[in-house]
Curated annotation (Swiss-Prot):
Keywords tagged on the record: ATP-binding, Cell inner membrane, Cell membrane, Ion transport, Iron, Iron transport, Membrane, Nucleotide-binding, Translocase, Transport
GO cellular component, one term: ATP-binding cassette (ABC) transporter complex
Reaction(s) this enzyme catalyzes, per UniProt: Fe(3+)(out) + ATP + H2O = Fe(3+)(in) + ADP + phosphate + H(+)
InterPro entries associated with the record: AAA+_ATPase (IPR003593), ABC_SmlMolc_Importer (IPR050093), ABC_transporter-like_ATP-bd (IPR003439), ABC_transporter-like_CS (IPR017871), Mo/tungstate-bd_C_term_dom (IPR008995), P-loop_NTPase (IPR027417), Transp-assoc_OB_typ2 (IPR013611)
Protein name (Swiss-Prot/TrEMBL): Fe(3+) ions import ATP-binding protein FbpC
One Gene Ontology MF term: ATP hydrolysis activity
Organism annotation: Escherichia coli O157:H7
Binding locations of ATP: 39-46
EC number: 7.2.2.7
Domain ABC transporter: from-to ranges: 7-237
SMART domains found in the cross-reference section: AAA
Functional summary from the UniProt entry: Part of the ABC transporter complex FbpABC involved in Fe(3+) ions import. Responsible for energy coupling to the transport system.
Subcellular location per the Swiss-Prot or TrEMBL entry: Cell inner membrane
Predominant subcellular localization, coarse grouping: membrane
Amino acid sequence: MSQKNFVELRNVTKRFGSNTVIDNINLTIPQGQMVTLLGPSGCGKTTILRLVAGLEKPSEGQIFIDGEDVTHRSIQQRDICMVFQSYALFPHMSLGENVGYGLKMLGVSRSEVKQRVKEALAMVDLEGFEDRYVDQISGGQQQRVALARALILKPKVLLFDEPLSNLDANLRRSMRDKIRELQKQFNITSLYVTHDQSEAFAVSDTVLVMNKGHIMQIGSPQDLYRQPASRFMASFMGDANLFPANFSEEYVDIYGYRLPRAAHFPVQGSGTVGVRPEAITLSNHGEESQRCVIRHVAYMGPQYEVTVEWHGQEILLQVNATRLQPDIGEHYYLEIHPYGMFVLADAA
């Protein structure tokens, strides 16, 4: 059974003066799904978040939430909560007062506020922190307080504006897992903004990649990585080696190196094939067409990041550090594994 589209942007454009920041965007978020807007700085992703929140008004188009046109409604009229990058906590209030502030403004009784604050803090693993203050807890704990403050209101839509960007790597990992866990537990329709690909992949049902105010591609994290639609997508969704290729019914020919043709590849003509670094391995044996030379080696802990020269082109690949220790100038034979290959539709 298909899910109801809970948030919808129809032909939305946003201009600031003569600058078009969002250009005729159409976007839907199914009920209970986490959709992430991913893209480089200035691509328009935060503007979309602010449009959904009601902090900005579109120059053209309509915004719907739960089937209602909210284009001209304020944020207070949209039943939305936002988790900010800066946490936006009140330093003069206790954590319990911060979390319960929204309920207090809604006129909820003191006893109910107290009980719901206790439950909300427990959800984010901060049980018993009601009487502490912002300056007594870490950045990661502050972000969890901000999340509890949003969840306690049981909003129709939850918005995340780069919520993990101020945290270190270990805290980011644990916090993103907590966000995803709670979003799924409470089935909250959510829109998440980040410029971090791994973060987007970890929290999302669907990722929408933007560039210069346009949607470049929409899909699951797996689809975007395995089947990018353009050169921009291939490079933005991780490292990619791009090769000229010739296609036939039986094989793909890259610099004379023939590989079995995947079912979804063209059966004739030429084009561009992309290969992810993890789909290329090095061997001591092979055909002359596979021969390459090591140009650069970087030790990355469990693996080496290796650059080889192959038919005059520099290729990036990853080598398991326990299996091979390549040195600059050494010759090997590269092997391309079909699971990491894709064909690009654009030639630009």
